[in-house]
C-alpha cells in the first residue's frame, strides 16, 4: 500500500527553511552512506551556502502541510570558468516523507529551472549502493557515466561513488547563464 498523497508546494528555499533542511540531511549523515560527511551540519552552514549560491543556482524546497519535507538544489561542478555551464544537483527528502513522489517532483522543478537558466549539463554524485537514488536519476533522464571505487570510508567500510549526468540542448558557443531571478 502506498502512502496517501498530500498537497505539495514547491518553492524557492529561504534562510528560514535551513533548520528543517539541516535536520533532513543530518539524518542521512548520521544513519547512512548516501552523504559522505561524517559530522552533522549546522543550520548556519546551510544558510551560508544558500546565501552564497542562490543567485546563480536554484535551491527549492518541498512543503507538505506546512512542513519542509525535502530540498533540491544545484551548485558549481568545478571552479574553472570552462565549467560554468555544468552544475552538480542534489536532492534530499525527509525520511518521514518517503514514497510521496517528492524527490521526482523537486527534481523536475529543479531541472526546468536549470534548463531555463541556460546550463548545459547536470551531474549527480551518488554514494553507492543507493538503488532508490539511481532509479530516481535514471527515471529523470540521467545516464550513468562512471564509478570511483572505494572513494570514501564511512560507518566501518569503503564505499563507491557513482556519477550520473543529464544534458540540455544548448548552442555552441553558449550564452551566459541567467540568474535564478531572471527565469
Swiss-Prot record:
CDD domains: NAT_SF
GO biological process, alphabetically ordered: response to antibiotic; response to herbicide
Residues that, per the record, bind acetyl-CoA: 91-93, 99-104, 130
Record-level Gene Ontology MF annotations: phosphinothricin N-acetyltransferase activity
Disulfide bonds: none
UniProt KW Calcium keyword: no
UniProt name for this protein: Phosphinothricin N-acetyltransferase
Organism for this UniProt entry: Streptomyces viridochromogenes (strain DSM 40736 / JCM 4977 / BCRC 1201 / Tue 494)
Amino acid at each position: 500500500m502506498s502512502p496517501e498523497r498530500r498537497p505539495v508546494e514547491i518553492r524557492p528555499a529561504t534562510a528560514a527553511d535551513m533548520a528543517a533542511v539541516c535536520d533532513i540531511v543530518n539524518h542521512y549523515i548520521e544513519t547512512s552512506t548516501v552523504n559522505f560527511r561524517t559530522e552533522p551540519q549546522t543550520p548556519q552552514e546551510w544558510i551560508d551556502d544558500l546565501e552564497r549560491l542562490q543567485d546563480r543556482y536554484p535551491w527549492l524546497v518541498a512543503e507538505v502541510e506546512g512542513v519542509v519535507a525535502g530540498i533540491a538544489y544545484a551548485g558549481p561542478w568545478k571552479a574553472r570558468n570552462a565549467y560554468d555551464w555544468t552544475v552538480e544537483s542534489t536532492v534530499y527528502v525527509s525520511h518521514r516523507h518517503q514514497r510521496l513522489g517528492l524527490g521526482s517532483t523537486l527534481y523536475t522543478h529543479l531541472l526546468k529551472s536549470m534548463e531555463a537558466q541556460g546550463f548545459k549539463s547536470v551531474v549527480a554524485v551518488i554514494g553507492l549502493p543507493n538503488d532508490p537514488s539511481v532509479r530516481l536519476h535514471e527515471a529523470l533522464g540521467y545516464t550513468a557515466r562512471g564509478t570511483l571505487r572505494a572513494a570514501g570510508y564511512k560507518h566501518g567500510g569503503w564505499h563507491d561513488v557513482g556519477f550520473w549526468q543529464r544534458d540540455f540542448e544548448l548552442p555552441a558557443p553558449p550564452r551566459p547563464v541567467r540568474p535564478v531571478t531572471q527565469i
